[in-house]
Amino acid sequence: MITAATWLSIEYMLPATLGAALGQCEVRECEVPQSSRPITPYAILFIGDESLQMSIQELGNIIRHRINVIIFIINSHGYTIERAIHGRHQEYNDIASWRHVQALSFFGNDEDHAKRNTFAATTWEELESVLDLVRKSDGVRLVEVFMGREDNQGALLDLLKN
C-alpha cells in the first residue's frame, strides 16, 4: 500500500500506482506488455479529480503497458481539502469539469474495453452495483464516484463550519 500522505503531493498517486504495478509485475514475472492479455496482479487507486488532472498523462502508460488496475476517481469538483483549509468559496479551489468516462478511449484503450470498464456512481446503490461489475472484469477499470463539494470529515469538517 502506498499513500500520498508521505509526500503531501497530490500529483503523486497515479504515477506511483503505475510504478508499483510495474514493479509488482516484475517481481511476479508477469506477462510481457506486448501480450494480448493484461498483467495478472492488479492495483487499486483512489484519486481525487484534482490530483488526476495534474498527472493524467500516466493513464496512457497504464493502458500501453496493459496494467491491471481499478481507478476510483473521487469527483468533488475541485480541491476539497484546500476548501476546508484555505476558504470554501475561493475560486482557485475549483477545477474544470472533465468527462472522465471518456478517458480510457481518449488515451488509447480499445473502444469496446473502455465502454465495458468505465463506470459512474452518484449513490451508494449505484456504487454497489458498479463494484460487482468491476470485480468481474480485468484490465484498466475506471469508476467515477461523485461526492459533494464539501464532503469532509473530522477536523476538516470543523474547519468548514468556521
Q: Could you say what each language-model-derived stretch is?
A:
Residues 1-162:
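Thiamine diphosphate
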